[in-house]
Amino acid sequence: MSKIEGSTKISEISIPGTHGTMALHGASFLDENLTRNQTMSLSQQLNSGIRYVDMRVKRVKDSFAMYHGVVNQKAVFEDVLKETIQFLKDHPTETILMRLKEETNPESGSLSFEEIFLKYKNVNASYFWDPNSVPTSDRNNPTLGDTRGKIVILQNFTSAQLYGIDYEGLNIQDKFEIGSGPDEIYTKWIAIKNHLQNTNINFNNGKIHLNHFSGTGGAAAFLNNVYPWFVASGKESRNTDSSPKLIQTNSTNAWSDFPRDRNGQVYYGGMNTLGTELLQQGAIKHSGIIAADFPGPGLIDSIIKLNGIHSNEKEILISQISSESSPLSGQQNRSSQNFKIDSLPVGTKELKWVIVPSEKDYPSTISFNVMIDVSLGIDSTRWKNISHESRTEAYTNTKYYIASPIGATSKFTVKIYAITN
């Protein structure tokens, strides 16, 4: 946010965020698929560019414990404030929007929500934005300059007075309850897409927009697999390298935004994947706040770039190769000629793989392996299940080739970028 003018209203900034920010644990391995919303810790999220966080708490006597539903997240609000304030000390040009909500019934004998909150706020008063510090007309939409170095509470609890911005006053899309089947998943996507388009048009009307990419099947997810990770990714498993889940093999005009392969087979589209692609197409110039489960660097950076700035990461094109949609004649796996990655820029921390398909295909449906051409011996696989915007460890070799592609109907190009700080 350091490169954004201080006079910019919060409503005019595109802000990456997380839903269920501290939801890192299930009560046991049995419910983790349902309960968990994130893999990154709070500090990792902040350092990745997240600036909206969603804090759910339970009152325990005179303190807040972090909860998701009835599941304890093995942290307390003091931990949250310690990490957030340290981040703001290290990055004083930033601001953190923090939704604060009572998640479950309090422990017997606990203080009121407001009493507990004030205990935390009073100790750390200089790091909480005070709505009384700006004119009444600006209290629901302050400028970035007013809030730099501060936590802005998006108040989702009742109290005698307002300690931040009224959460219920935001323009919110939060269709979080999702049934089974492609129609339900697609309805969630349309809600996201419509809200993005509305935000893009109305971002300067003084209203802060919040778009939840998150969703769940709730308890029914144990039967229908509509877990938060599936809603986010549309994939067959929680593994980030897994393939998109197939809906049906025959061609159809239904679910038109969902990805298809060359035979017309239709796959589920994850909200994060579809959202990232829409943001990268260029029609959306402003997103408001996006709260996602399991956001990756592609989504986070796509939101940040809408502000006309970039994250601290740099992408340097180091190689590219054209591949056929299936193995070359006489080849078992190989679908391209050899290409090399033989020189990595200083500071390279990983590689990013970008798929540029033909007009008939979608990058999100294509995946492939990368193999090494071994002159005297059996070719080996360096990377498996590479998909659009996958990130991998960086290894050099002069004889890589694309192998075993799926999901493409014709030639596609693979661009390889070195990611540096």
What are these regions (language model features)?
Residues M1-S48, K61-D90, T95, Q161-I165, ...:
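Long, acidic (Asp/Glu-rich), low-complexity accessory segments flanking structured domains
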Residues R56, M98, I153, I290:
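Conserved, mostly hydrophobic/aromatic
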Residues N122, F128-Q280:
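Surface-exposed substrate-engagement region within the catalytic domains
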Residues P135, E324-V346, K360-P363:
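Surface-exposed ligand/attachment interfaces on beta-rich extracellular proteins
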Residues E359-G377:
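Short, surface-exposed beta-strand/strand-loop-strand elements in extracellular ectodomains
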Residues R382-A394:
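Beta-sandwich interaction modules
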Residues E393-G407, F412:
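Noncatalytic modules at the cell exterior or secretory-pathway interfaces
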Residues K411-N421:
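Short, structured beta-strand segments at or near domain termini in extracellular proteins/domains
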